[in-house]
Amino acid sequence: MAVGKNKRLTKGGKKGAKKKVVDPFTKKEWYDVKAPSMFAVRQIGKTLVTRSQGTKIASDNLKGRVFEVSLADLQNDEVTFRKFKLIAEEVQGRNVLTNFSGMSLTRDKLCSMVKKWQTLIEANVDVKTTDGYLLRVFAIGFTKKRNNQVKKTCYAQHAQVKAIRKKMVEIVSREVSSNDMKEVVNKLIPDSIGKDIEKSCQGIYPLHDVLIHKVKVLKKPKFDVGKLMELHGEGSTTTSKGVTSEGGEKVDRVDGYEPPVLQNV
């Protein structure tokens, strides 16, 4: 018979008492994410954050979050291959105000455009907007057959590719450097820059599927709450006798109106 302690008898019970299960969601709260006024749909979703406690403030944890949203959801559109990045810059009440932070195409759209028997032409350029944003803009285009062409391939010569790339850089630089960020985003939504490039390059070589396929924000100007509020259509529209609704329309307020007292803050 083996000599030793019987572990089952000497042990008082299971190691450690049963811990109380705490639902982590009880310490969190939801915030509404608002898109800038350039887009048709302003309410793009909700985000979760831990409640303010001691020195840890909820709004500080929200600032800097990046939300990637399909343009179809932002514009109530069927074109789904463009994605916009929106960065949280300010928190007002339960609303998170965002600003443009980048744009890209979906992977499947890029893959579907690349085919045999044609030349792919890419260009990128760093441009500064009038309000101080430094953007890196990437353009892409593909050659296509000329009218009544019998030949299967439509390869462009090296000199033609260089000329088209130069034209791309010129048009992108002109369109971005002469506008502020709001106007640039308004051009990116329908991709009017890509259409201008396609039209201008017809004399060099016919192109199709000319798109701005990516935009990166390299540098931003110093943060200004006033400019962000203007971007959201809430800067100069509020008056003493009127308030601005979520869609940007002025709503008359009754004289002597006071907001209801909140029970919990």
Curated annotation (Swiss-Prot):
One of its GO terms (molecular function) is structural constituent of ribosome. Pfam families: Ribosomal_S3Ae (PF01015). GO terms for cellular component: cytosolic small ribosomal subunit. InterPro entries: Ribosomal_eS1, Ribosomal_eS1_CS, Ribosomal_eS1_euk. GO terms for biological process: translation. The keyword Ribosomal protein applies. It is found in: Cytoplasm. PROSITE patterns: RIBOSOMAL_S3AE (PS01191). Component of the small ribosomal subunit. Mature ribosomes consist of a small (40S) and a large (60S) subunit. The 40S subunit contains about 33 different proteins and 1 molecule of RNA (18S). The 60S subunit contains about 49 different proteins and 3 molecules of RNA (28S, 5.8S and 5S). This is Small ribosomal subunit protein eS1. It comes from Aplysia californica. The lineage of its organism: Eukaryota, Metazoa, Spiralia, Lophotrochozoa, Mollusca.
